[in-house]
């Protein structure tokens, strides 16, 4: 049997187990849909886990600054996948910590928008498609990650997780973040997307020698040099590249602690 298939099947099974565990243990769950490759895989896995239909809302915290292709993707597949789509706007930048660097401050609007959505809907669990290999701060995360009453993350106080034993009880008055693809890599995401024929936003594919490896707000996200015009070529490129996945994200190039400050305050 193809070893790649074995590996992807194992990843899929573990992620589906985590999704079902979260659904069984939490009363009011939602899946955060950023519209990027990772959260699209998350929706695909959730549809598989629950026999074709996602049984909890898909929450898009909208900055109003995404690429047009991302909004077109959301509108099409929100309907096609029959999602209970909740689109919640972010507040203006005036509501954000003014001591943050410019790009981080712009990105932090999502944190404030997420806090408003939590207050509005009362979710006790939020599923997010982050991965440990993306960024150093996310490498410190847990699969079931408790948040404080204001949505904050205490990086120094994370519960141990051994042998698939998870603490799936949210703190009083707070919520859990659930990360079912935390153990995946960027290459895993693309290999699975190819195998499952998951729809993608065309910005991920090269045009005129450029493509986006990571998608965010249009004003703080930039393409990288690439000739990869299909997923097979993306996978080959990833085997050789030394360029970080988030090289096109402006906030990752600001102060050394900017991203961790965002995540401690409740960012994804």
Task: Tell where the protein language model's regions lie, with residue ranges.
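Nucleotide-activated chemistry modules centered on ATP-dependent adenylation/adenylyltransferase
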Residues: 1-268
């Amino acid at each position: 049997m193809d070893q790649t298939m074995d590996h992807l099947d194992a990843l899929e099974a573990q992620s589906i187990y985590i999704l079902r565990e979260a659904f069984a243990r939490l009363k009011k769950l939602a899946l955060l849909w950023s519209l990027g490759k990772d959260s699209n895989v998350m929706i695909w896995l959730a549809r598989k886990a629950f026999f074709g239909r996602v049984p909890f809302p898909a929450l898009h915290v909208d900055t109003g600054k995404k690429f047009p292709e991302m909004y077109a993707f959301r509108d099409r597949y929100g309907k096609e996948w029959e999602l209970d789509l909740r689109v919640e706007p972010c507040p203006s930048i005036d509501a954000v910590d003014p001591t943050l660097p410019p790009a981080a401050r712009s990105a932090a609007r999502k944190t404030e928008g997420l806090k408003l959505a939590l207050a509005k809907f009362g979710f006790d669990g939020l599923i997010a498609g982050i991965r440990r290999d993306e960024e150093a701060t996310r490498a410190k995360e847990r699969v079931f990650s408790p948040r404080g009453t204001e949505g904050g993350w205490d990086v120094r106080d994370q519960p141990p997780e051994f042998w698939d034993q998870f603490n799936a009880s949210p703190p009083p008055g707070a919520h859990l973040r659930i990360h079912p693809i935390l153990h995946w890599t960027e290459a895993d995401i693309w290999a699975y997307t190819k195998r499952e024929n998951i729809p993608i936003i065309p910005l991920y594919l090269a045009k005129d020698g450029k493509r986006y490896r990571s998608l965010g707000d249009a004003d703080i996200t930039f393409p990288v040099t690439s000739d990869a015009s299909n997923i097979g070529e993306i996978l080959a490129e990833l085997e050789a590249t030394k360029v970080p996945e988030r090289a096109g994200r402006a906030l990752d190039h600001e102060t050394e602690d900017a991203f961790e400050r965002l995540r401690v305050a409740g960012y994804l």
